[in-house]
């Protein structure tokens, strides 16, 4: 099956439903996105939101965040989720490659992402695509 990746620009009912189905597969604690929250996310200048389709159905999503800082334009891949039934069929790769192309065309100096250690297949995918593990600590302040 062919995977098609598109940039999302409008919070349609289909997109809202897809996020409602996909987001819980990424995080049990993530609140559901309503139309207003999705619209705010899509309209933010730093974000490029991608969806992947197989046979017309949305089976994955990825958000690329690009921010200019004093050391240059930096990019991050966030909230990658592929529907459980579509994993292993190239969806994650197609989404990541699309984000890589956009970051490269914007002349981002770096493209970072994080992945949980237990997600071995995701780690292997990112390494196949050229990402390398950094010797870095990640800190988080919960609100």
Sequence positions of predicted segments:
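A conserved beta-turn-beta hairpin within the catalytic core of GNAT-like acetyltransferases
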Residues: 67-77, 87, 134
């Amino acid at each position: 099956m062919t995977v098609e990746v598109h940039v999302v620009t409008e919070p349609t009912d289909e997109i809202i439903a897809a996020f409602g189905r996909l987001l819980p597969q990424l995080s049990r604690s993530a609140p559901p996105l309503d139309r207003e929250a999705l619209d705010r996310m899509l309209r933010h200048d730093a974000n490029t939101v991608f969806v992947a389709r197989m046979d017309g159905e949305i089976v994955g999503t990825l958000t690329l965040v690009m921010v200019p800082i004093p050391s240059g334009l930096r990019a991050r891949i966030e909230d990658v989720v592929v529907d459980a039934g579509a994993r292993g069929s190239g969806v994650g790769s197609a989404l990541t490659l699309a984000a890589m192309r956009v970051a490269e065309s914007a002349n981002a100096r770096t493209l970072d992402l994080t992945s949980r250690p237990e997600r071995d297949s995701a780690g292997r995918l990112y390494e196949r695509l050229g990402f390398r593990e950094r010797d870095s600590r990640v800190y988080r302040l919960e609100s």
